[in-house]
């Protein structure tokens, strides 16, 4: 480092100059004076000294950096590509001792700083305590000042009372002096006391103060009498003050007693309110439980009633099919030559009684087979009933039959009914005021009647025996939802006694007979006349009635009560509406949406609201 600056520093020496070169400000130059030369030379020497000092500082910094670099190399040795570590000589480890010394010094300074910090914290705590004590003293001082003000006000009131008594005594003395004017000279009125405290001292002080403002009485007895009166008045005032203090203490004791009684009354009232609230809660829980039980009973009765209605509807369909088959057989006997001419299929033997006509003709023509949408498979009713016709065509069984008044033959299209069961002769349509048998049978009960039947009965006491369920359960009575009770298994009797087909049909007519007031509500729209009106209407009317099977084939399990009766109650509010929607969130549902799924949706609302 020193060799770097040797060339630059050599310019300050005279020897570094060449023989032909001389100092510009040298002493040999006659153009410059001696003072100028000495000044410039001194400036150069000063600059040279500064530069040397700077170079020394830089050298020291470089040495420090070298030591630190060596320490870092010792701490983090470099590994070569061949896996060998750089070795360091022992003299380089001496810098570690310097670092240890610096570390010790820094640790000492750190401890000193921590000690000072702890002292400052203690001083701050002491200062905080002093501030708190000062604040307490200020509060006590303010309290004492208020008490002193109260005492001063009390003293002033007492002094005013004493001044009033003194004035009264002066007036009485003036009257007495006027009465005894012949015995004593006129009394000089006492001057007003400017200060109340001085007046009080004069009143209770020694003889010098006592006679300062009073005239010298001629007789000692009069002054003694007045003094005694004043002392008596003062004692009376002191007695009144003591009585007032006693009354104040009594009132304070009474106030404390009343406060204790008030606290006791508040505690007893809170306990009474808590007990009443618990009783009210228990009563509410009991009432809600009773309501749920009543709803469960009513809902179970509703399901049983719906099961009976389904049984009646299936029985009605069976009766109607039997009547239609009998009418078709009677018509087939009259039109058997025509049916044999149109149907090339072989005849089917009939197991009917001997009074019946001979075996029926072929059941269906090829054209009818091409046009009929129903596959030619025998129905279960044909396999079970011995009185049913042996026609293999399932049209009379698959399509629900209706009375002859609602069927009309099609002259343009060949009927799919087999020749042995031809369609009856067309009849004129009934008048508008008179309903057909199917309309009377399938009359829909009004919604308010359904709700009344649901909410009217609350127990099982009104029911004698259950009706028999026949056929598969409908989609809305499947045991998929936990909130719907399962239908019960019953025998082959309805309401405790067997029913004949004629009595059952009459019972259905009477049960579903529509009231005159509901004529407009459930009147069925009149369909336009068409060639196939009877066939289409029969299929649409009886599509919901499956072919009845044996009652023992499909028996339902024991009924279980529902668990969400509020959901069922909310569901009953939408019985009479055409659009199915949730009564809580007003969410719309399709027309064929099942009731159990809608009840599940309402249950989710009730569970979220913790009802």
UniProtKB/Swiss-Prot annotation:
Transmembrane segments: none annotated. Residues 48-162, 218-277 form a coiled coil. Residues 362-372 have a biased composition (Low complexity). GO terms for molecular function: zinc ion binding. Residues 1-280 are annotated as: Homodimerization. GO terms for biological process: innate immune response. Residues 346-361, 389-406, 416-433 have a biased composition (Pro residues). The modification Phosphoserine is found at residues 184, 365, 372, 379, 385, 400, 415, 500, 530. Zn(2+) binds at residues 582, 585, 601, 605. Residues 328-437 are annotated as: Disordered. Homodimer. May form a heterodimer with NAP1. Interacts with TKB1 and IKBKE. Weakly interacts with DDX3X. Adapter protein which constitutively binds TBK1 and IKBKE playing a role in antiviral innate immunity. Essential for the efficient induction of IRF-dependent transcription following infection with Sendai virus. This is TANK-binding kinase 1-binding protein 1. It comes from Mus musculus (Mouse). The gene is Tbkbp1.
